[in-house]
Amino acid sequence: MLLGVILSIPRLVLFLPGVPVTSTLPSQPKDADLAVSARPSAQGRFGRYGGQYVPETLMPALAELEQAAALAWKDPAFTAELDRLLRSYVGRATPLYEAERLTAHYCRSDGGPRIWLKREDLNHTGAHKINNALGQALLALRMGKKRIIAETGAGQHGVATATVCARFGLECVVYMGAEDMRRQALNVFRMRLLGATVQPVTAGTATLKDATSEAIRDWVTNVETTHYILGSVAGPHPYPMLVRDFHAVIGQEARQQCAEAFGRLPDVLLACVGGGSNAMGLFHPFVQDRSVRMIGVEAAGDGVETGRHAATITEGRVGVLHGAMSLLLQDDEGQVQEAHSISAGLDYPGVGPEHSYLCEIGRAEYAAVSDQQALDALRLVSELEGIIPALETAHAFAWLETLCPTLAAGTEVVINCSGRGDKDVNTVAEKLGNQL
């Protein structure tokens, strides 16, 4: 397992199994506009976050991936094929939906904010994850890699990866924590039905962190033949940039749709954050628009005061996990702590380095809501809008209870409805069954 390390000095040593890696922390940019204009740096840094903390055996593969992505984005044939498949296979563009009854629920005497949903739950496979999986599968084909591995927590990234592998005839192995397999049995069956091998991970807490560690071990062993489709804006460079750029279609569409719907930019963007891919996909095209507030909502689990949570930005400290420097949940010795969330997709003790950076420079805000708040929000949205959101997405909806009373009348709020809740029905039934 890659260890988390507390940083109290300007030089860091990360110990991988038998592989010492050193890195000097870069200084922070002074100018706020400069700080957001070029992300990441040529070294894969978002300020002091990001980088490549991996065994030497992976460095050529990361360099190959970075070069392949750079060339692909400049190739009209690649972008045309990606756009074609996003339309015809994934079902993009996803609509921007005015949630009239949810808006009315939070209405005050002066009118209150207006709430819009970016409907990523309507994508093929039921979540935003297919955007990145499709893009990386096309890159793997360009690199001649025929074997694909992935990690998954809630199972949505695993399903998306298995889906694109079936589409292109690629071998697929998905690593998934045994506890998450129990919680997400439907998605496990979907992956196997699509022809993927689902490899249970029983180490540690048997959740997303441990699945990611096992996927990295596989990649180290089989790097010549295998491409790792990492599912979030985490991991070593170029993954945080690569995954962000494939998901940026979310924010690009939302920007145009807002102009068509109400004639200007939104005032607030709201999204759940585990590793942070759906949030970054929505945020990225708006980062340089200072009038747009960007709010990420983490999982407070049983409450941040209990220690049983996954509120990494809210409660974390700087360290290294899974090849990148970011904020992590750690103990006093720098060991990565167990995370907890009712949502398997948010049950992760780290976060993408760009989120850590945007928080540090004050460009984005981050909050946390509990399991119970997420359940209450899931039920509310289901009853008011006829849309059952994923438990991950429900965390973003839950923050409306705190946010809406603070917003001026006429404020336009866009929530990334990142996934549908079919996969969570059993979990929700266990928690709410006696209340329905």
UniProtKB/Swiss-Prot annotation:
Cofactor requirement: pyridoxal 5'-phosphate
One Pfam family from the record: PALP
Keywords, in A-Z order: Amino-acid biosynthesis, Aromatic amino acid biosynthesis, Lyase, Pyridoxal phosphate, Tryptophan biosynthesis
Enzyme class: lyase
Gene3D superfamilies for the chain: 3.40.50.1100
Cystine residue pairs: none
PROSITE patterns referenced in this protein's UniProt entry, alphabetically: TRP_SYNTHASE_BETA (PS00168)
InterPro entries per record: Trp_synth_b_CS, Trp_synth_beta, Trp_synth_beta/beta-like, TrpB-like_PALP, TrpB-like_PALP_sf
Chain positions found as N6-(pyridoxal phosphate)lysine: K129
Annotated catalysed reactions: (1S,2R)-1-C-(indol-3-yl)glycerol 3-phosphate + L-serine = D-glyceraldehyde 3-phosphate + L-tryptophan + H2O
Biological pathway: Amino-acid biosynthesis; L-tryptophan biosynthesis; L-tryptophan from chorismate: step 5/5
Enzyme Commission designation: 4.2.1.20
Matching HAMAP family: Trp_synth_beta
Assembly with partners or alone: Tetramer of two alpha and two beta chains.
The family this protein is said to belong to: Belongs to the TrpB family.
Task of the protein: The beta subunit is responsible for the synthesis of L-tryptophan from indole and L-serine.
Name of the protein in its database record: Tryptophan synthase beta chain
Natural source organism: Prochlorococcus marinus (strain MIT 9313)
